[in-house]
Design a protein with these regions (language model features):
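NAD(P)-binding Rossmann-fold cofactor-contacting core
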Residues: 1-18
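Beta-loop-alpha module in the N-terminal Rossmann-like domain of NAD(P)-dependent dehydrogenases
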Residues: 19-83, 273
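NAD(P)-dinucleotide binding in Rossmann-like oxidoreductases
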Residues: 178-181, 194-276, 294
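Rossmann-like dinucleotide-binding domain that binds NAD(P)(H)
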Residues: 133-209, 296
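C-terminal helix-rich "cap/oligomerization" subdomain common to oxidoreductases
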Residues: 40-43, 78, 266-267, 280-324
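A contiguous active-site-proximal alpha/beta segment in oxidoreductase catalytic domains
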Residues: 48, 71-134
Length: 324
C-alpha cells in the first residue's frame, strides 16, 4: 500500500500507524494524483463521490477497484458506462465480492455440473442486525442493500431478467435511527422468462445478527449456501437430492472471516472474499489484463433494482392486500 486518502488526515495517519503499512497520507484525490506515487487505487468513498473520484483517477492513468454502486442512479450509471466504454473501457473493476466467495463459487460449480438438475429458482437473503446508523444517507433499502444479492443471481445464472417487482414494509428498525429510508424490510422478485425466478430478501430487522443465505432450487434437489449463526466462523454448502434421499449429494465447509470485536458484521461472512477480490484486482493490474468484473456489471444490477423500485409497493401505496 503506497497511499491512503482521507479528508480526515488524522484518522488516516492513525490507520497507517496501527497497520504498519508505511503508506503516505493525502487529504484529497487531487493531492494523491499530483504525488504520482501509485497507479492502482481502491475507491471506498460515499456513493455520491464514486463517479467524481473514479473519473479523476482513470484520467490520471490509474486502474480502479470501485466499491458498488457506480453512481447510485440508473441514469448516472448509463452515462458513466458510456463514457468508460468510449474512453477507459478496461480501467474499472466493480467490487462485487460475492463473485470471489469460495462458498458461492462452489455452489455455482455444483449448479453448472448439473448436481441438482435444472435450476428454476434462486433465493438470496441479506439481513442486517440493526438499522442504518444515524446520519447515514440511503437511496432506499433496495439500492442500499440488495445490489450484491442481485449481482449474485445474475452471476450465477449468466442471464438478465425481463421483469421485476418489489414489496416493502416499515415494521421495526426505522424507528430506531434518524436515517431516512423508505422501508426497513423488502422483497425483490425478478423473472427470467417463464423458467427461472429470482427472489431477494433484505431487512434491517434481524436482531439476532447478520444473516446471509442463498438457496438454489432445481428439478433434482437444492443447494443451500450458509445458515444463520451468531458466531459465523464457518460457511456450509450442502446439496440435497429429492425427498427420501438419505445423504447429501455434496457438502463442503468454508472458513468465515472472523472479523472480531469492532469489525463490521459483514466481515465475519465475507472477509476471505474481500481479500481474494483485492488479490485478483492486483494480479490483473500487474499483468495488464482484463478484470473479471466491469462497470457494465454494475449497470446490469442497477437496471434490475431500478425496475424493482419502479414497481415497489408498500401497504400505504395501495398494494393488493386481502383482508382476512
Amino acid at each position: 500500500m503506497a497511499a491512503v486518502v482521507d479528508i480526515d488526515t488524522d484518522k488516516a495517519n492513525r490507520f497507517v500507524s496501527r497497520s504498519g503499512c508505511g503508506a503516505q497520507v493525502f487529504g484529497s484525490v487531487e493531492e494523491l494524483i499530483a504525488a504520482n506515487v501509485c497507479d492502482a487505487t481502491m475507491i471506498v468513498t460515499p456513493t455520491a463521490l464514486h463517479r467524481q473520484h473514479a473519473e479523476m483517477l482513470v484520467r490520471a492513468g490509474h486502474r480502479v477497484l470501485l466499491e458498488k454502486p457506480l453512481t447510485g442512479t440508473l441514469a448516472g450509471d448509463k452515462e458513466f458506462c458510456d463514457q468508460l466504454d468510449r474512453e477507459y473501457p478496461s480501467a474499472v473493476m466493480l467490487a462485487f465480492q460475492r463473485r470471489f466467495d469460495a462458498a458461492l463459487q462452489y455452489a455455482r460449480e455444483l449448479m453448472e455440473t448439473g448436481t441438482i438438475g435444472k435450476v428454476f429458482k434462486i433465493y438470496s437473503a441479506l439481513e442486517d442486525s440493526g438499522p442504518a446508523p444515524n446520519g447515514y444517507q440511503s437511496d432506499g433499502i433496495l439500492p442500499d442493500m440488495s445490489v450484491h444479492n442481485v449481482d449474485e443471481i445474475l452471476w450465477l445464472t449468466g442471464r438478465m431478467p425481463d421483469r421485476a417487482m418489489a414489496v416493502g414494509s416499515r415494521i421495526y428498525s426505522h424507528a430506531l435511527t434518524t436515517c431516512e429510508e423508505d422501508f426497513d424490510d423488502a422483497m425483490l422478485y425478478m423473472w427470467f422468462g417463464d423458467d427461472l425466478l429470482g427472489q431477494v430478501q433484505v431487512t434491517r430487522n434481524h436482531v439476532s445478527g447478520y444473516r446471509v443465505e442463498s438457496i438454489l432450487y432445481g428439478t433434482e434437489g437444492q443447494i443451500q449456501i450458509g445458515r444463520f449463526d451468531q458466531r459465523p466462523d464457518a460457511i456450509v454448502v450442502e446439496a440435497f437430492g429429492k425427498r427420501g434421499a438419505s445423504d447429501a449429494l455434496a457438502r463442503k465447509v468454508f472458513p468465515g472471516g472472523r472479523g472480531g470485536n469492532g469489525a463490521p458484521e459483514f466481515v465475519d461472512r465475507f472477509g476471505p472474499a474481500y481479500k481474494r477480490e483485492l488479490e485478483v484486482f492486483l494480479e490483473c493490474v500487474a499483468a495488464g489484463g482484463a478484470f473479471p468484473t466491469s462497470h457494465r456489471d454494475g449497470l446490469r444490477a442497477q437496471q434490475v433494482i431500478s425496475a424493482g423500485m419502479a414497481a415497489l409497493k408498500g401497504v400505504a401505496d395501495g398494494v393488493d392486500v386481502a383482508s382476512i
